[in-house]
């Protein structure tokens, strides 16, 4: 590495600004500011069409016209590339090469399958190939073209003196390439991998690959070979099968073949084959001025008839409703009903044809019906309607089968199984059944003539699955599914005139509706013209604006440099080494970027697995339909990460472990069923992982295998995985926001002050219904979520229409249950309950009429009736006996008796020492210890007894029975006065006498629960949001020292938030200093209580002891939570009234908002199949913006105004994480300062702007991060160092093929990036006020605000250094104004008169009341700002 550059990043040296050379893009035009409402308007884009095509096509035609002279049309054959000495030799006519040794080595039986229609065309095909460079074969499915045409070529070459022959045949799908190659070998009696073999990806048969003369491969394999070799001359014949599918790879392959035919490969023969090809279009594409490729047609000639009917011909079904609209494709309810009527017509028709006279329910219903529907949603709708009809009419006997691309192997086998006698098999299928699956017993087809097409907006990269009318080609393909074994009928659910006049003949090619990144990269690799020039030569050229947008995206992901030969070009850019890698990986560019960053951060294998999992669809089985248990498996594998991508990685590791352990097939199937996984998809994923590993090995993308560079710690790996995920899917950044409007007060007021992390609620309950009678019924609303009733408390809002369900905070789970980690502090049961709402958002509850209920409780003597109002029974609480800290006590001294973590420990005030000693003496009296437990059945959950603790018996309650060892039964007990839980044998338990029970059963615990206040675990050292062991050890060491001094911050739900005093400072601050914790706000309830306690303690000296005691008892009484008495419900026969509850809901439910310009005004949702579909505020007390990253985004809605995020990941809850990730991984960024130029307040990121016009190059993908914590100049220096190191890993000089960095350099890069990143993410940052501005999305001239940093790699830098604007101290008069404003707020703190709303100038927050002002003064934001301006704090 350059020492000067390393010195630049040495932070031990003083940072001195120097005049540095300008970057390759400079700007000197003044910035402009747009109005804020301008940001809400859609971005105006210029759509440039296909006018650019004409000049390039004419030029190519001239090149094509010179391909073949009369002399070169002789039947002379090709020689191999190895025989050529130079490029100039390509133009010469090749010498004839024989291969007699090869033909003698293998058996060639080339005169078979004469019955196939293609055989009759053999001579015609041979003559056409001899006389033309390109031949088109159009043959119906089943005519034999795929398996017979290549052997015909062999026969032709054998007859020509056994000339050399090397044939390659492409297939659009890998399974087809493999199966057809094996079938040809079987037919010709060749050993697989010799004469005939296959290659899919990098996987190929290696038996005798040198002898392979007939290679079946995927389209992508041949395309890569040709792009790398830049010639066709490795082959004598190239056969492109299924050309009609018109995928991007096929269309670009046609471009490459036509160009190479016209330049250096004029003697190679090309055969294009398809069943539904447009021969005229292809013939014109390869034609020159003197000739055009001939078309040879081979028809199949069916033995059975296929009758076609249209909607207007089906008089018997009486279809009502509107006519079809070409602009509004879809299926109405009447359309579904008409399909069902058609099924009934088919049944009646079959009965009549057989003339059996059988009744409807006796009909055999032999022929299956195949219904073509556009998507899984429509399949579900059709299935539901058929089920409803079958339920209402038992004689309707249907055997319904689904068929779509995500179905499991078991579901696929079901398609081919015969139905039970008397049942009609109805297959509801998407277009996957057009060609991929043939079901022999299908006699009828119902075709809605619809399909779903994935279309991508190249300007935003948002994809949308659009409903569209199918082409006539598709419809004919569907009709071809019948008439093979018997006569068939096709019912098209459109009118005949609509079909004939409105439906297009062919589908829209993929190149016109999908991203073009891979095509552009192939064009750059091919080096035969610019991307615009090459794509202009496509069979269906894309719009110029789509190509330009693709160029911008490739610049954004690092595949292209911003400039071309040193100059910015909106239509081109020099390819980077990243782009070279991306062109060689069969992945989306963002997934390739994931692997590249995985290499940088030494997580390449994890990145490969995730990339493969995102490429292979359907790993989880139809999670939207199988219920909560299936969905919960996402959480099992995500393991608290909040990331679908981490879940994929863990699924694969589990699958791999299962395979390595040799699990039997049946056991594997059971494992997959249990976790709702598709073995077929996992197997496909495994093949892709192996392929990617091999490709990465060839590209030298290998992990560092030294122990010091391997990330072994799961916590560190989890953070780094999130880092590379954020880097890979830039700019798909979203900010999480609370759904509850207003401040934190609403979060608690809606649920009556209960814990939002454990509580859900239902609405639409009637207060007069006496809800406490139905608590058990409410608990039974969660069976599908598998939440046991004993694990929840049900309470009711006084005077409201809500039912609250609070899940118990017990760390001990019932036996047989698996603990599943979820993000943050929230209970897993909350996620389970909320997921239920997606399946059913209304729940019925049968209750009694109010008057009958009143009489019922009166007769049963349940509770009390006061003035006609029922008071439910409750357990009295003697608040004067509670050990909770008094309202007037700020400091309490005592002992910590038990520590679960820094977030949960138990404290025993020293004032109870004598009480504890007396109790212990009483309990350990020999007379009290005589009640030994002789029968384990006498010990039940919740029973109070005596249990041995540290040699003495203390009172305890039974938590649960440990039944693992039936011979030696043990019990988990909780020591009431110490807080710890122990597993004890029966011999160490004693039953309490009646005298002891009378005295101590109702005595509250002589301790209280605590947690550390104003801090939370630091994400960099925390797993599952748990406190790190080192922090817990520090607390343990403090507890062992004896008495400790607590400062009570607040008391909420009987848990005290405390600071633990040390000789200097307190433990809370020490944990922050040691980076084991970070500062955080307390939640609303805690701040309210703290404010109340402070004000009461301030006036303590003015209140008498008796009054203080009275106030404290009222205070403690108000702190007691509502009780669930678990009353028995009334008899069902008396519950005649029905209430429909809505929910459950949570006050922590969140929404996400886009940071991208193009997503600002759109509604954002998360995919229902994502682990984050139920998105909650996992740290409700934390006011920092939390970041969500999506691997892909789809758009829906009438104006594509609803975005759905797929494969999402919640980023670590680290303040400033979004800003740091943006600055590290964006192409360019501007840091914007506040008006005083004292701090950075926002980041604008994108690929940059035009230096003269100041217009953004890629406005749609510009994103803004508004800062809520301090990012300073030294942070940006660290970020620049990381960017430089990433660039260094891949930097290569112009013209070089490989990076210049060697192994030692890579070790240095790794050892530099990790510490720098750790410093950035673990830094304790001050909170700052938000400063949103109307010019946030406006690029500005930064020349006057700071010098640009040097660009070490100049224009060959993917991550150029960020300019660091110089900051200044705030002016003194501004500081004095802020101090005055702060003092004024403190003066108002105890004000009780009329209050005029005011603004906190430090935090830019509007305060409407004194109560709001008091709570604001307690926030970390305000406290940090006070320190910043030097406000004196008492």
From Swiss-Prot:
SUPFAM superfamilies: P-loop containing nucleoside triphosphate hydrolases (SSF52540), Tudor/PWWP/MBT (SSF63748). Its EC number is 3.6.4.13. The lineage of its organism: Eukaryota, Metazoa, Ecdysozoa, Arthropoda, Hexapoda. A motif (DEAH box) lies at residues 241-244. Keywords: ATP-binding, Cytoplasm, Developmental protein, Differentiation, Helicase, Hydrolase, Meiosis, Nucleotide-binding, Oogenesis, RNA-mediated gene silencing, Spermatogenesis. GO terms for cellular component: nucleus; P granule. Residues 936-999 form the Tudor domain. This is Probable ATP-dependent RNA helicase spindle-E. PROSITE patterns: HELICASE_ATP_BIND_1, HELICASE_CTER, TUDOR. It comes from Drosophila persimilis. PANTHER family: ATP-DEPENDENT RNA HELICASE (PTHR18934), ATP-DEPENDENT RNA HELICASE TDRD9 (PTHR18934:SF113). Belongs to the DEAD box helicase family. DEAH subfamily. One of its GO terms (molecular function) is RNA helicase activity.
